[in-house]
A protein has these predicted regions:
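Charged docking surfaces used in two-component/phosphorelay signaling
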Residues: 16-24
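Short hydrophobic/Thr-rich beta-strand motif most characteristic of the beta2 strand and flanking loop
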Residues: 26-33, 41
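Active-site residues of response regulator receiver
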Residues: 53, 83
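Receiver (REC) domain active-site loop signature in two-component systems and cognate sites
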Residues: 56
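Short, glycine/charged-rich "phosphate-handling" switch motifs in NTP-dependent
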Residues: 100
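C-terminal output helix
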Residues: 107-116
């Protein structure tokens, strides 16, 4: 049975690129446009990993991760943050919220797949 990954990003084109790479690697994918959309799509669904942008309208990625970690069923689900910002303060904030990995945009799909496989496969 394939593992399911949720991609949360306000850029439809980025979601598409990530989705194609993940599906090509054998993962099932759910997409959401922001944190609010993501929380709604998680209702009654089990995902094994979440990839979330940091800067999004409505609910940013760090707020989304904080809300996600309040949900018992997702407390230990790994999260990879995507961002154009690579500052240490943002990284610390994301890690404090519960993110396990940080990928700076632009990135190559292979780079993302290494991080995904590392967090999903153990």
């Amino acid at each position: 049975m394939a593992k399911t990954i949720l991609i949360v990003d306000d850029s439809a084109s980025l979601r598409q690129v990530v989705s194609i790479a993940l599906k090509g690697a054998g993962y099932d994918v759910i997409e959401a446009a922001d944190g609010v959309d993501a929380l709604a799509k998680l209702n009654g669904v089990k995902v094994h990993l979440i990839i979330s942008d940091v800067n999004m309208p409505t609910m940013d990625g760090i707020t989304f991760v904080k809300e996600l970690k309040k949900l018992t069923s997702y407390k230990f689900t790994p999260v990879i943050m995507l961002t154009t910002e690579c500052g240490d303060d943002k990284k610390r904030e994301g890690q404090a919220a519960g993110a396990k990995a940080w990928i700076v945009k632009p990135f190559k799909p292979d780079q993302m797949l290494v991080a995904v496989n590392k967090l999903v496969m153990p």
